[in-house]
Amino acid sequence: LTCVKEKSIFGVTTEDCPDGQNLCFKRWHMIVPGRYKKTRGCAATCPIAENRDVIECCSTDKCNL
């Protein structure tokens, strides 16, 4: 499985997930109202949302773009 690690104006950085990590995730963490920090990567299980974060998980290549 290949997941997106970073997305910027310079392009997309991907990572090949190690064995046992069969999900890609994308997390939005609110810094201040209207401003979010996005985190992407591989995971074995879908992370649990904390502090009003929004998390999406998926299981196909680059699905967390």
UniProtKB/Swiss-Prot annotation:
Disulfides per UniProt: C3-C24, C17-C42, C46-C57, C58-C63
List the subcellular locations. Secreted
Tissues in which the protein is found: Expressed by the venom gland.
Annotated Gene Ontology cellular component terms: extracellular region
**Keyword tags:** Disulfide bond, Neurotoxin, Postsynaptic neurotoxin, Secreted, Toxin
Pfam families reported in the protein's UniProt record: Toxin_cobra-type
What Gene Ontology terms describe what this protein does at the molecular function level?
Answer: toxin activity
Family from the record: Belongs to the three-finger toxin family. Short-chain subfamily. Type C muscarinic toxin sub-subfamily.
Further information in the entry reads: Negative results: has no effect on ligand binding to any of the mAChR subtypes at concentrations up to 1 uM.
Q: Whom does it interact with, and what assembly results?
A: Monomer.
Write the protein's name.
Muscarinic toxin-like protein 2
**Species this chain originates from:** Naja kaouthia
